[in-house]
Swiss-Prot record:
Residues 1-56, 387-450 are annotated as: Disordered. The lineage of its organism: Bacteria, Bacillati, Actinomycetota, Actinomycetes, Mycobacteriales. Residues 431-450 have a biased composition (Low complexity). This is Uncharacterized protein MRA_2757. Residues 19-39 have a biased composition (Pro residues). InterPro entries: DUF349 (IPR007139). Binds pyrazinoic acid (POA), the active form of the first-line anti-tuberculosis prodrug pyrazinamide (PZA). The keyword Coiled coil applies. Keywords: Coiled coil. Residues 1-10, 395-414, 421-430 have a biased composition (Basic and acidic residues). It comes from Mycobacterium tuberculosis (strain ATCC 25177 / H37Ra). Residues 163-192 form a coiled coil.
Length: 450
């Protein structure tokens, strides 16, 4: 109480019956018991209540509050003017009313915690029966009851929303934990799965409002799943390292074998061997990228060395066969110009051409058949031209010559087969067969002569 404020005595005892008027006693009166004073808030214009309507002051200074429940003493005013007492206890009522109004506004605007507002309203309602104020306390009680009831509804709605939010947040973490467990159990795309687990953790950190015990259990699920994934991934790459080590050793052996074959001149067999080595290379799998690339360069260098040499040898052989074919073309041109009217001269010239033909050597398979066909046509032409006037000794000599040529080609075929030159052996056998047929034809002609 300030020096400028009249002293008053407030009582918080039970209100007496109106007929029992207290008698003043000499000496100081006890002051009011301490009660919580409503907090003052800066508010707009609020019409003050009329304390005269809800109270009275006895001649001895006793201040009475009048309410629906009756009258009760709220204090004693000994400082002079009763109007000052009405003003004092009226201001205290207005302060309490203002506090209740602010509570109501916070509740209506949603700026206050409904649970705290409800508790505050209940606490203030409990102080009304002993509040040292003059005013319409019944109206305040009704307002506090209304605030309490509405706060309870709002708090229930808030609680429902919180529970819904908690359920939704819990469901999100449940889904993330389940996804992490699925990745831990089945994922094989390790980088993608690892990135996703990190993204799950980032999202996890943004989810709040989950019950602590539930949150701890869900976190344990996620953490266990992440550990399981990391172990699986570690095991996978450890096994991959072991496999790559085995692949590396296998491919090193293939490289060594390829390098051994790179200088071979057995073109056919070595080509087949290189094809097998390449198939083995593809079946061996892959080592780590840098190792695999280095081994492949080594293998391919050996392979290229062999095939470059083979291609050069093949080109040289093909050039030789073309030259032989050109030489035999020239002999054929000479043979096809022979004058068969002088069959003795024609036969002699043809024998010389045949000897040169054999000395030239082989030609490519594509041209051999055509060249042989043309030569046999010339031989047939010369033979038929001379058959009319052959003598027996001449015919026998011719048949013997054919047999000798057949035996010569048979001998060449045997030598080629023994050396593994299959193609050359086949060609020699074909020539031997042709000459054998001519020898047999010549022998048949002798037997048919008169």
């Amino acid at each position: 109480m300030t020096a400028d404020e009249p002293r008053s005595d407030d009582s918080s005892g039970s209100a007496p019956q109106p007929a029992a008027t207290p008698v003043p006693r000499p000496g100081p009166r006890p002051g009011p018991r301490p009660v919580p004073r409503p907090t003052s808030y800066p508010v707009g214009a609020h019409p003050p209540s009329d304390p005269h309507r809800f109270g009275r002051i006895d001649d001895d200074g006793t201040v009475w509050l009048v309410s629906a429940s009756g009258e009760r003493i709220v204090g004693s005013w000994q400082a002079g003017d009763p109007e000052a007492a009405f003003a004092h206890f009226g201001r205290r009522f207005d302060d309490l009313s203002t506090e209740i109004m602010l509570m109501d506004e916070r509740l209506a605007s949603g700026t206050g915690d409904a649970r705290k507002i409800k508790a505050h309203a209940i606490a203030l309602a409990e102080t009304l029966p002993t509040a040292c104020v003059l005013g319409d306390v019944d109206a305040l009680a009704d307002r506090l009851t209304s605030i309490r009831d509405r706060a309870e509804v709002i708090a229930a709605a808030d609680r429902s929303r919180r529970e819904e939010h908690r359920a939704a947040q819990t469901a999100r973490k449940e889904a993330l934990a389940a996804e992490a467990e699925e990745l831990a159990a089945n994922a094989t795309q390790w980088k993608v799965a690892g990135d996703r687990l990190r993204a799950i953790l980032d999202e996890w950190k943004t989810i709040s409002g989950v019950d602590r015990k539930v949150d701890d259990a869900l976190w344990k699920r996620y953490s266990t799943a992440r550990d399981t994934f990391n172990r699986r991934r570690g095991s996978h790459f450890a096994e991959l390292d072991r496999e790559r080590s085995g692949v590396r050793q296998s491919k090193e052996r293939l490289c060594e074998r390829a390098e051994e074959l790179s200088e071979s001149t057995d073109w056919t067999a070595t080509s087949a061997e290189f094809r097998k080595l390449l198939a083995d290379w593809k079946a061996a799998g892959r080592a780590s990228k840098d190792v695999d690339d280095a081994l492949w360069r080594r293998f391919k260098a050996a392979q290229d060395s062999f095939f470059t040499a083979r291609n050069a040898a093949t080109a040289e052989k093909e050039a030789e066969l073309r030259a032989n074919a050109d030489a035999k073309e020239a002999l054929l041109a000479e043979a096809e110009r022979l004058d068969t009217t002088n069959h003795e001269a024609a036969r002699a010239a043809l024998r010389s051409i045949a000897e040169k033909w054999d000395a030239i050597g082989k030609v490519s398979r594509e041209r051999a058949a055509e060249l042989e066909r043309r030569l046999r046509a010339v031989e047939k032409k010369v033979r038929e031209a001379g058959e009319a006037d052959w003598s027996d000794p001449q015919a026998r000599a011719r048949a013997e010559q054919f047999r000798a040529r057949a035996e010569q080609f048979e001998h060449q075929a045997e030598k080629a087969a023994a050396a593994g030159r299959t193609k050359e052996a086949d060609e020699a056998k074909a020539n031997a067969e042709q000459w054998r047929q001519w020898a047999e034809a010549a022998a048949d002609a002798l037997t048919r002569r008169p």
